[in-house]
């Protein structure tokens, strides 16, 4: 007997019982995006490898350790996308969407990183990202954060996420801080773990978000990033904080907050939670004013964020169990008798025409009334429409409210109107 082929480790199947809650959450997110005037862009999951090396940085963990890279039959190096911003910028440049224009874009789909799989962190994972181009003031940074705050309210998780903010300044200011930080770390090299020693010269800002408690204790005496900010970045950050305060959005300034990708400048932010154990970040982003030019376009200010959907689903399920998936079926059409199936299918098609948006499932595979009502209950139907031989003969149907148990005989021409009233 042939051995069963299973999914690749860290790349998961999501079965119908799971995808239903995903669909409701995604629908909520998309509705909010639409209310802010953001437009969807759809991007390839495979890009040329140099795109990510140039955008993310060759000495980042993502590029050095985590990318799925391969050669195609022409010998070109291709990579499964580890994040969405680089591809979105590439598309904007390629299709002339960015220069001297304002764009508010969002995308959703799978990303790929070769990490150690654990709860909330997978090798294939799903992100929803937003990117705004052509606007450089702190007001658009604030709007993106306000948008995410509206998501949390809509999902019922506002009390379980907190906002952390920082400014990492201009590229020049960050270079000055980098030198000061490296000098400090060199003086205390014996207290660093091997990972931090490696990062000290390649990407020293990542030492700031080390998870090692001893390193974090050492960093209490390190130079503060805020002391090295240029004046424009200070003003930009102060403006952002003022806007968030006016909007009633609470935040904490975390001067050790940096992002793991090299393209960020000025604003960086994270929404974090204590409800998912070690995987605390739900949504993160910031400003990347130099990336468009870095990838071959003309200088264009930009800001954006990405959110891991697996973690968001876990969080919603953990803290808001009342946020349930929509039922698979609203109406279940029960048919019993030798000649009723054809009539039932015809009635079902008519009801789908007259009740757009209502989910109606017709029973197939026979079965007595008891079995069919059991199926209706399994699919979460609120109402059953019953056709037996006598109903077909006299042009009626029985409409049964599966919650109250009340049932009514209705002329088939009036079934849609009756259902509309019953379903509200």
From Swiss-Prot:
One of its GO terms (biological process) is histidyl-tRNA aminoacylation. Pfam families: HGTP_anticodon, tRNA-synt_His. Gene3D superfamilies: Anticodon-binding domain, Bira Bifunctional Protein, Domain 2. Keywords: Aminoacyl-tRNA synthetase, ATP-binding, Cytoplasm, Ligase, Nucleotide-binding, Protein biosynthesis. GO terms for molecular function: ATP binding; histidine-tRNA ligase activity. It is found in: Cytoplasm. GO terms for cellular component: cytoplasm. Belongs to the class-II aminoacyl-tRNA synthetase family. CDD domains: HisRS-like_core, HisRS_anticodon. InterPro entries: aa-tRNA-synth_II, aa-tRNA-synth_II/BPL/LPL, Anticodon-bd, Anticodon-bd_dom_sf, His-tRNA-ligase, HisRS-like_core, HisRS/HisZ, HisRS_anticodon. It comes from Escherichia coli (strain 55989 / EAEC). The keyword Methyltransferase does not apply. The keyword Ribonucleoprotein does not apply. Its EC number is 6.1.1.21. Homodimer. This is Histidine--tRNA ligase. It catalyses: tRNA(His) + L-histidine + ATP = L-histidyl-tRNA(His) + AMP + diphosphate + H(+). The lineage of its organism: Bacteria, Pseudomonadati, Pseudomonadota, Gammaproteobacteria, Enterobacterales. It is an enzyme of class 6 (ligase).
